[in-house]
Amino acid sequence: MKLLKSIIAICVIAFAVPSFGQSSNIKTVKFKVDGVCGMCKDRIESALDIKGVKYVNWDLKTHVCEVTYRTDKVSEETFHKTLTAIGHDTEKLKASDEAYSKIHGCCKYRSEEVQDAHKDEHESHDHD
């Protein structure tokens, strides 16, 4: 009986220690990313679908990107570099003019005309 209790205790410790260590490697960050439409949302979230990222959501209304990731696999700096490489400014880095020029015309968030067009489009549909 004593042997059985010892084996159970060892098993509990063996399973508890690895899971405890993993949870300390998980972090969630939120940061601003410029964009204006659903295409931007798809592009931003797809770009951050990388090894180590567990969850990503970019909110069109607030422009806040929330990322949950493993700190032992990827860094927050990688997110900013990845997004600027595909043409989206973040609160820490600005996309190059070359990268920005490659995004679709309706996604040109630096243009006041495009921003206004998306505001008009949003205001004209139902909010049920």
Report residues per predicted region.
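Histidine-centered metal-binding segments
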Residues: 106-128
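N-terminal targeting signals for Sec/Tat export/insertion, comprising classic cleavable signal peptides
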Residues: 28-57, 61-62
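Processing junctions and N-termini across compartments
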Residues: 15, 31-34, 100-101
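Mid-chain, structured segments of secreted extracytoplasmic proteins
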Residues: 60-108
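Bacterial Sec-dependent N-terminal signal peptides
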Residues: 1-26
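General secretory precursor processing signal
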Residues: 14, 40-43, 109-110
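Cleaved targeting-peptide boundary
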Residues: 20-28, 121, 126
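The N-terminal extracellular segments of secreted preproproteins, especially immediately downstream
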Residues: 10, 36-39, 105-106
